[in-house]
């Protein structure tokens, strides 16, 4: 397996990510992984919570001779732009740019590009499939089954409760950041931006 740092141009924003390729020459079928809501990096991590979900999936796919691309959302990790000023449409445009990038890779089979979206990423994956005719299929992981506003507010409340419930000295920096950037207020701001976009 080879992991290659890549840069995807989405209008004036440079998105950085990892193209994970199986051993061998290819071309390979490929999966674009679109993360869920919030400022999540290419491995589906946020400060204080390292899940590495998309990294684990990418490594398992490589063992099955399937390539994958995972990327930092705009304004997150090594990608340019500002996450908090990005609209939902911007995030869809970014994912579309990633599929166009994949079409140009010699190691990728252009007729076998799949898009997997987790949570909010499932909405984005579906929108990418309607805009890009070459998408072979979509995979919806934990798709939204309620109003997005309700889901976002529940996530913020759960995150705040989880962080504030932590004990010990190591939890203090995370608690401080949570108090400084209250997840509930951040989600309300995000919801407002989504409604305006």
Question: Where are the regions that the model predicts?
Answer:
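N-terminal cap/lid segment of alpha/beta-hydrolase-fold proteins
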Residues: 1-26
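Short glycine-enriched nucleophile-adjacent loop
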Residues: 122-132
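Conserved alpha/beta-hydrolase
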Residues: 53-78
């Amino acid at each position: 397996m080879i992991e290659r740092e890549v840069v995807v141009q989405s209008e004036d924003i440079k998105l950085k990510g990892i193209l994970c390729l199986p051993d061998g020459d290819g071309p390979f079928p490929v999966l674009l992984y679109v993360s869920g809501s919030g400022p999540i990096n290419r491995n589906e991590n946020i400060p204080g919570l390292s899940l590495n979900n998309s990294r684990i999936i990418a490594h398992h796919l490589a063992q099955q001779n399937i390539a994958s691309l995972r990327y930092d959302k705009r304004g997150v990790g090594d990608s340019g732009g500002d996450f908090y000023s990005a609209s939902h449409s911007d995030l869809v445009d970014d994912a579309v740019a990633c599929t166009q990038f994949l079409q140009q890779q010699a190691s990728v089979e252009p007729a076998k590009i799949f898009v997997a979206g987790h949570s909010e990423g499932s909405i984005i994956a579906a929108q990418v499939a309607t805009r890009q005719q070459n998408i072979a299929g979509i995979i919806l992981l934990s798709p939204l089954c309620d109003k997005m506003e309700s889901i976002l507010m529940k996530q913020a409340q759960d995150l705040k409760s989880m962080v504030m419930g932590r004990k010990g000295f190591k939890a203090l920096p995370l608690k401080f950041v949570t108090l400084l950037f209250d997840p509930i207020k951040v989600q309300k701001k995000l919801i407002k931006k989504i409604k305006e976009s």
